[in-house]
C-alpha cells in the first residue's frame, strides 16, 4: 500500500466525516488494481476553489478552479510519488449536479489523481478507456457506483 499524507487546507471539508479513512481507502482500492504500481508517499490536499484555481493557473496556464490536479514528483523524489489537490467547491457542485454523495465523488477523484501519479492519462481515447476501467474497478471495491454509466467500460488493462 502507498502511504498518504493528508492536508486539509479548506475548512469547507470539515463537514465531511471520516476524511482520513476515505482517502486511505480510495488509495488502497486503486493500489489493488495496480499490482505493478510504483510505491511511495502521496500528498493529498483538500483545498478550496481559490487555491486550486491559483495552482491551475500557475502550473497549467488555465483560469479557474478544476476538481482535481495531480503533480507527479518525478524521478528524483526519493519515496514521494507526487501531490493531488482537490477543490471543495467544484467537487461539491459536481456531486450535487450529478446527484451523488460528496464522499463518493471525492473517492473517484482521488483514484483518478492517483492514476495520473502512476503514469496513466486520458488524452487519447484508448488511454481514457484503460484509465476509466481501472477507476470503475477500484470504485466498485468501495461500493461506489460507476461514474461513467453511459459509456462503454472498455476492455481494461487486465482483460484477456
UniProtKB/Swiss-Prot annotation:
It is found in: Cytoplasm. InterPro entries: MetalPrtase_cat_dom_sf_prd, YbeY, YbeY_CS. Its main location: cytoplasm. GO terms for cellular component: cytoplasm. Pfam families: YbeY. It is an enzyme of class 3 (hydrolase). Keywords: Cytoplasm, Endonuclease, Hydrolase, Metal-binding, Nuclease, Ribosome biogenesis, rRNA processing, Zinc. GO terms for biological process: rRNA processing. Zn(2+) binds at residues 112, 116, 122. Its EC number is 3.1.-.-. The keyword Nuclease applies. GO terms for molecular function: metalloendopeptidase activity; RNA endonuclease activity; zinc ion binding. SUPFAM superfamilies: Metalloproteases ('zincins'), catalytic domain. Binds 1 zinc ion. Its cofactor is Zn(2+). HAMAP family: Endoribonucl_YbeY. Single strand-specific metallo-endoribonuclease involved in late-stage 70S ribosome quality control and in maturation of the 3' terminus of the 16S rRNA. PANTHER family: ENDORIBONUCLEASE YBEY, CHLOROPLASTIC. Belongs to the endoribonuclease YbeY family. This is Endoribonuclease YbeY. The lineage of its organism: Bacteria, Pseudomonadati, Pseudomonadota, Alphaproteobacteria, Maricaulales. The gene is ybeY.
Amino acid at each position: 500500500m502507498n502511504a498518504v499524507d493528508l492536508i486539509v487546507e479548506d475548512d469547507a471539508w470539515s463537514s465531511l466525516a471520516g476524511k482520513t479513512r476515505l482517502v486511505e481507502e480510495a488509495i488502497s482500492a486503486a493500489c489493488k488494481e495496480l499490482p505493478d504500481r510504483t510505491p511511495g508517499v502521496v500528498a493529498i490536499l483538500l483545498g478550496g476553489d481559490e487555491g486550486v484555481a491559483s495552482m491551475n493557473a500557475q502550473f497549467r496556464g488555465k483560469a479557474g478552479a478544476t476538481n482535481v490536479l495531480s503533480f507527479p514528483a518525478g524521478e528524483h523524489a526519493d519515496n514521494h510519488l507526487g501531490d493531488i489537490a482537490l477543490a471543495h467547491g467544484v467537487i461539491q457542485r459536481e456531486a450535487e449536479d450529478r446527484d451523488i454523495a460528496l464522499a463518493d465523488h471525492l473517492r473517484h477523484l482521488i483514484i483518478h489523481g492517483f492514476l495520473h501519479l502512476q503514469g496513466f492519462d486520458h488524452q487519447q481515447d484508448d488511454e481514457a478507456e484503460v484509465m476509466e476501467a481501472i477507476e470503475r474497478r477500484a470504485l466498485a471495491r468501495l461500493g461506489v457506483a460507476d461514474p461513467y454509466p453511459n459509456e462503454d467500460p472498455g476492455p481494461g488493462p487486465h482483460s484477456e
